[in-house]
From Swiss-Prot:
Top-level enzyme category: hydrolase
Keyword Transcription: no
Any one Gene Ontology molecular-function term assigned to this protein's record: phospholipase activity
Protein name: Sphingomyelinase C 1
Organism: Leptospira interrogans serogroup Icterohaemorrhagiae serovar Lai (strain 56601)
Subcellular location: Secreted
Coiled coil: none
Reactions mediated catalytically: a sphingomyelin + H2O = phosphocholine + an N-acylsphing-4-enine + H(+)
Length: 597
């Protein structure tokens, strides 16, 4: 039954009469103000009118305060009945079937003028990077160069000029200390790593335990004050290697210039063969945990909520679209390199996931139920370290991680990467024999197949990456004669080496996984820096007879066009090659970026 509250009608009518009188007076005053503005000596008249208008306006404000539902707790009820309250709420919300609202809520574009765009008016720049720093006590990983890579990440340029950084996969204690301490001056506000301790958190939720061998590896650092820190431990990470980790997510509330940003950083269940089909199910449960947590926080609609991290969900898959729906987030505008785990360009990824195809797994997403920026871009970037690092077994690399980082931002600016960072001067070079004018190439069918100078056409198999491991600079502008590691550009981590059983006991050359010839060298016959068109020869050490010999293109029989270690002194056309640098420019996505105009 609809009932009315017992309010004297005279009071209600008087209130509307007062409002009517005020509006009439204001209208008359403004008309008089307009007329007097055209007359001399108008200043005093105008000031008097403005004072009157201000008084009327303040009076109206006071009347509103007096009528506020917060003035008297006993009267903190709407004048309409409960049913009309619900009806009003529904009337104010756009309906899917309402012809005045042509867009459905799920397709509503990001709108800078929407009431939910308050905190988005102040831009936020956030970086997410899964840095593959597993603890050494897990035997399946061991030495990954964690501490050396931490040093290089801390001093790198790709982590500069951000508001927030979310690191995932940072479970190595010493590497964590090195990295966080070195970046503290730029990012002074830091969380603890998820899952190690309850100290330093405002709250610890979920299935926290002290028994796992490793923490959850997620850390958030910020240029701006962190007002709240919560860690949540998943209770369903029980598949494969993840069962040994306290995996979960970190939540922080950040205050940037008075505006609040809410960030969740996480690393979901890994994609492991040991998990069979259960990995996707576990990730769904973990996404449910994240969404339930966000809902429980009752975050104001005009504040931005970001969900970021190594989500281990392949972009474009059914699982990906389920994630977008479950989290109720907008798809970002994707720019940059096409994959974040790229086994074709990232040697560290290729080393540990040799059989995997390149995939995109890392995201920075914006909740649709909260403040919306005018646009939201995710840029996957492929930087390399300026200096190389070495593992204890001698493996040398310039990769920061097996994953590429992702930037999240509204508009690009002068600090936004616009080109691939993975293009080195002496990558994807080719060698053309001066004897038969053919290019050296790796085997098309076998990663560890023979090297042969047998094609006149440049292909992916004729390209090789050069690295001088005794030179710390990863991308030198000048490479001179000397010791060199030659890697197939197509088969990453497969290096030139010899097999002494080829052709009745001779040194035949092929590409071998993670094992290049220690004594292989390159000689620039034109002297100076290696450049496009340089004439070069390759030499190596004879481990049986002793002494250095040059590699030659065999010219007869069943081993014709194979490479052998053969000539010691005199160089003929069979031992001389033209070096061709790769003339292709690095991938450029500057035209795909959106800048503020």
């Amino acid at each position: 039954m609809i009932t009315k509250r017992n309010i004297p009608p005279c009071k209600k009518n008087w209130k509307y009469k007062k409002k009517s009188i005020s509006l009439t007076l204001i209208t008359i005053c403004y008309m008089f103000l307009f007329l007097t503005s055209c007359k001399p000596g108008k200043k005093n008249s105008i000031n008097l009118l403005l004072l009157l208008l201000n008084t009327l306006d303040n009076k109206n404000v006071n009347e509103k305060i007096e009528d506020s539902t917060n003035t008297d707790p006993s009267s903190n009820v709407n004048e309409e009945d409960e049913n009309s309250i619900n009806a009003n709420a529904n009337d104010n919300a756009p309906s899917d079937s309402d012809s005045s609202n042509p867009r459905s809520p799920d397709k509503n574009p990001v709108n800078p003028t929407s009431p939910n765009s308050s905190s988005a008016d102040i831009g936020i720049k956030i970086l997410s990077h899964s840095i593959f720093m597993a603890p050494t006590n897990l035997s399946s990983w061991g030495d990954l160069g964690q501490e050396e890579r931490a040093q290089r990440i801390a001093s790198s340029s790709y982590i500069k000029n951000q508001d927030i950084i979310v690191f995932e996969g940072l479970s190595h204690n010493n590497a964590e200390k090195i990295l966080l301490e070195k970046i503290r001056s730029e990012y002074p506000y830091q969380t603890n790593v998820v899952g190690r301790t309850k100290k330093g958190w405002n709250a610890t939720l979920g299935a926290y335990t002290t028994s796992p061998m490793a923490n959850g590896g997620v850390i958030i650092v910020s240029k701006w004050p962190i007002e709240e820190k919560v860690q949540y431990i998943f209770n369903n990470s029980n598949c494969g290697q993840d069962q040994y980790y306290n995996k979960g997510f970190a939540y922080v509330k950040i205050n940037k210039d008075g505006k609040k940003f809410h960030v969740i950083g996480t690393q979901l269940q890994a994609r492991e063969p040991d998990c069979f089909n259960s990995g996707e199910t576990i990730r769904k449960l973990q996404l449910n945990d994240i969404k339930s947590f966000i809902d429980s926080k009752d975050i104001p609609k005009d504040e931005t909520v970001l969900i970021t991290g190594d989500l281990n969900i392949i972009k474009g898959s059914n699982e990906y679209f389920d994630m977008i729906s479950k989290l109720n987030v907008n798809e970002p505008r994707y720019v940059g390199v096409p994959f974040t785990l790229d086994t074709k360009t990232n040697a560290l990824a290729a080393y540990y996931y040799e059989k995997e195809k390149p995939i995109y797994l890392d995201y920075i997403l914006v909740s649709k139920l909260h403040a919306q920026p005018p646009v939201w871009q995710n840029l996957a970037y492929d930087p390399i370290s300026n200096t190389t690092w070495k593992r204890s077994d001698g493996y040398t690399s310039y990769e920061f991680s097996d994953r590429y980082p992702v930037y999240g931002f509204i508009y690009a600016d002068s600090s936004t990467p616009t080109k691939s960072g993975h293009k080195r001067k002496y990558d994807q070079v080719s060698f053309q024999s001066t004897f038969n004018r053919k290019f050296i190439q790796a085997d098309h069918n076998k990663k560890d197949g023979w090297l042969k100078a047998d094609t006149r056409i440049k292909t992916d198999f004729t390209k090789f990456n050069l690295l001088q491991e005794n030179v710390s600079e990863s991308n030198p502008s000048c490479m001179n004669s000397g010791s060199v590691r030659i890697e197939s550009s197509y088969y990453l981590n497969y290096y030139w080496n010899w097999f002494i059983g080829a052709a009745s006991g001779d040194y035949g050359y092929y590409t071998k996984f993670n094992n290049g010839s220690d004594s292989l060298g390159i000689k620039n016959l034109d002297n100076g820096c290696l450049k496009d068109g340089s004439r070069v020869a390759f030499y190596d050490w004879d481990t049986i007879g002793g002494g250095y010999y040059y590699l030659t293109v065999w010219d007869k029989g069943s081993w014709k066009e194979h490479l052998f270690l053969w000539v010691q002194s005199f160089l003929s056309s069979r031992e001389i090659f033209y070096l061709h640098l790769d003339s292709n420019p690095p991938k450029d996505w500057s035209k795909d970026l959106i800048y503020h105009h």
